[in-house]
């Protein structure tokens, strides 16, 4: 049975990862695809490290944002804050190269959420992978 695609809501306009009004932000918009969220991103020179390469810190930010959205969306709206994240860089991401970002919620308890995310090229080559442990926000 096909899964209906849903776009995740904006929680803030100024977020570096997803805020549409942040002039230097990534402006990521995630879609729900069954048991994961996904988005696409094509890096520009604004996010360059070495000439022609996406900065590793931006890769970390993209993975963190994706895992945060997976945690929020796939747990039916629980807000959580990243407590620990691990990133494994596999291949360089090139400026101007379209990237696919996917993330999923892997574990949920009352106080903790765990998520994983992957950044890959269109041909399926994995650029980076990440995992995170997030603490449920006390306001939830």
Where are these regions (language model features)?
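Short histidine-centered catalytic/ligand-binding loop motif
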Residues: 45-57
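Non-catalytic linker/capping segments at the edges of enzyme domains
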Residues: 1-46
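Hydrophobic core residues within well-ordered beta-strands of beta-rich domains
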Residues: 26, 35, 81-83, 99, ...
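Active-site helix/loop of acyl-thioester processing domains in fatty-acid/polyketide metabolism
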Residues: 36, 54-77
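Beta-strand secondary-structure signal
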Residues: 38-40, 86, 100-102, 114-116, ...
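Hydrophobic beta-strand-centered segment that forms part of the acyl-chain substrate-binding groove
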Residues: 66-100
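Hydrophobic residues in beta-strands and at strand termini
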Residues: 41-43, 89, 136
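HotDog/MaoC-like acyl-thioester-processing domains
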Residues: 1-6, 93-95, 104-140
